[in-house]
Amino acid sequence: MSAMNPDRPKAIPASLTRRDVLRNMGGLGLLTLTGGAGTLLGACTTAQSGSQVLAADPEIAALVDSVLGIDMHSHAAGASGRPQPAYDLAERIRVGRMTAVCLCHPGDAPVIKREPDNRIRTVRQPEPGELWRFTQRRLKWFDDLVTAQGLRRALQRGDLEAAHRDKAPAIVQTIEGCHFLEGSLERMGEVYRRGVRHLQLVHFFRSDMGDNQTEPADQGGLTSFGRDAIVECNRLGIVIDVAHATREFVAAAAQASKTPLILSHTSVAKGQPAAFSRRISPEHARLVASTGGVVGVWGSPSTFKSLSDYVDAVAAAVDVAGVEHVGFGTDNSGFGPTLAVWDDYRDFPVIVRLMRKRGFSPDDIRKIAGGNYLRVFNLSVKAT
């Protein structure tokens, strides 16, 4: 289930979702529902859907249309195999008037698990070749998805701008964790040929790329193999994502890469984060910014309880890294409800309106909501 969100209406009967109410109420000012969950009065006055924001505020609607909206980190459905999406991702991108989603599959999904304390840990070692075979299945899943939902793949410079111009929902195909390499850099060329243009180097499972934030750091940051992988990403034309990596890893990656770095999903702590935290320090954020890169703000339910909280976190990241170096990285699932505080792309106009209320200028919103990622994408991928 999605986390309860103060920017949305109060709970309503289980037979009717909050979003169903909002999308069916149209311009009505009052509605009363009775049942086991109690009574909902005046839902439209306490929260609006993205569609209602667009209809009610022409200025926000025009701004949304001018924004090339991109989520730098979202998940493909399911942990393994090729599950069917719970809903139409392309339609949600289209209704929210976004442009693209960096849609990933975690390369270590078969060997990790969320445990009762809510931490994700490695539960077993993979069999030789297992994670490569898993990735090959997921590449086929992406092929099927693009065909079934009519999505575009962003593969080269200009593709994201064209998707925005044509109002055609797009994905930047992403792998979260380079575990599929299993020591073979040649496989990077294979996933590139299959449409991958964004690679996150590490995830939860211990990687030969280097140290991650959620395991004891014992590899000195970035390994020589990790450095070679960065060079290969630069050669092929792949966006380099250092989410989940330690600060020492990121510092070495900044030296190794010829292109700016993305840190797709995190939040910036006020000081030094706790051990094994996925948050980053201000110095860590500024390190990414120093490459010309972008830090994506996630929607962690353990940290943020509303879309307003999320926008506040974006503002805090901007204060640290600068408006040219912050973006959206929701860490939601593109295909079903999650605990992420922003779990539905139809809410994009709500985010834009909240940013305006928070004091962001239209130009700043265009940068944060997608322009900054677009800059790094175009500097990283090939022209043709």
Per-segment meaning from a language model:
Residues 1-20:
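N-terminal secretory signal peptides
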Residues 22-32, 343-384:
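Mid-to-C-terminal alpha-helical segments outside catalytic/metal-binding sites
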Residues 69, 100, 170-172, 198, ...:
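Structural preference for beta-strand elements that scaffold enzyme active sites
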Residues 73, 195, 240, 295, ...:
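Conserved, mostly hydrophobic/aromatic
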